[in-house]
UniProtKB/Swiss-Prot annotation:
InterPro entries registered for this protein in UniProt: Band_7, Band_7/SPFH_dom_sf, Flotillin_fam
Keyword Amino-acid biosynthesis assigned: no
Taxon lineage: Eukaryota, Metazoa, Ecdysozoa, Arthropoda, Hexapoda
GO molecular function per UniProt: protease binding; structural molecule activity
Pfam families for the chain: Band_7 (PF01145)
Disulfide partners: none
Organism of this sequence: Drosophila melanogaster (Fruit fly)
Any single biological process term in GO: protein localization to plasma membrane
Signal peptide: none
Any Gene Ontology CC annotation: cytoplasmic vesicle
Protein name: Flotillin-2
Subunit structure: Heterooligomeric complex of flotillins 1 and 2.
UniProt record similarity statement: Belongs to the band 7/mec-2 family. Flotillin subfamily.
Amino acid sequence: MGNIHTTGPNEALIVSGGCCGSTKKRTIVGGWAWAWWLVTDVQRLSLNVMTLNPMCENVETSQGVPLTVTGVAQCKIMKSSSYKQTDYHNDEADELLGTASEQFLGKSVKEIKQTILQTLEGHLRAILGTLTVEEVYKDRDQFAALVREVAAPDVGRMGIEILSFTIKDVYDDVQYLASLGKAQTAVVKRDADAGVAEANRDAGIREAECEKSAMDVKYSTDTKIEDNTRMYKLQKANFDQEINTAKAESQLAYELQAAKIRQRIRNEEIQIEVVERRKQIEIESQEVQRKDRELTGTVKLPAEAEAFRLQTLAQAKQCQTIEGARAEAERIRKIGSAEAHAIELVGKAEAERMRMKAHVYKQYGDAAIMNIVLESLPKIAAEVAAPLAKTDEIVLIGGNDNITNDVTRLVAQLPPSINALTGVDLSKVLSKIPGAKA
């Protein structure tokens, strides 16, 4: 009997031996294989990418300058990329992987990497001896391509494929690269200083031009902004005017409509008041009629009855009573006529007195007015002295001269006060009195 062995795409399965003394090897990648017990040998070979770091220390170049070069190489065991996989094995895969299996079968990945690394370092040393420092340092890609081109056939015969090879670092212990860099740096610095000066000059010119352009753009923009602002303000003013006009018209229309509504309301109120007054007049008229009927029932009819009784009594008392009543009525009539005549005469006398006073005032002028003033002075003095009537005690502080001065000043204030109250200049009136001094 036997076992079934499987493998993934990153691993090769090498099957050798078999029944009847077979010497054919089979290589399976990403498949499976049957192995008989005791007579079949099954081994595995990794197909993963191997990263190598070749390093050559103090290797002399063609100029005798010792350099140390480090690189990075990516390698893997070759296999076909176009073979057709079957369930058991593939002849092309057997052929391509046969060399690698012969070289590395049974070895670990570390041992395989060490073998490839030594081969790459040997070719790297050989190529370094044919190049100058400048060629190695300045054109690393060309150097790496050359190493890969030279080393590829050798590692290919071992069934190894170089996927990539790059130079990681180049340096030396004799300061050759530093010295080379200093000279180049000096040249570069010189050119750089000149370039900086020219660049500064060009930058200054360009900056001035840019600043001028920026200022032109700024001024142009400011001008446009001001124009737009002015247009905006003008349009806004026009819009505001239209809005205010519309608001004013709306307000006027509202006020007019409100006035009309108030007028209609007032008319309705007036109509209501008219109706109320009419109703009130009707009610009052009805009340008058009611009172008239009431008076007729309570006063007139009893009075008529009483008159009829008195008339009956008068007739009973015959002519004496009638004549007495007539005499009394005549007496009362005459008394009323006399009183009315007296009142009329008193009114006429009062009117005549007022007319005569007016005539006298008009004829005598200031004298009449003086008479009025003189008649009014006691009343004015009484009114002025009225508050003093409530005074219990008056204390005068100062000498007799002060009292005299106060009295004089008080008296001197009377004419202006009278003039302000009555419109009469008391000084002028008194000056017209014979023997008086103003």
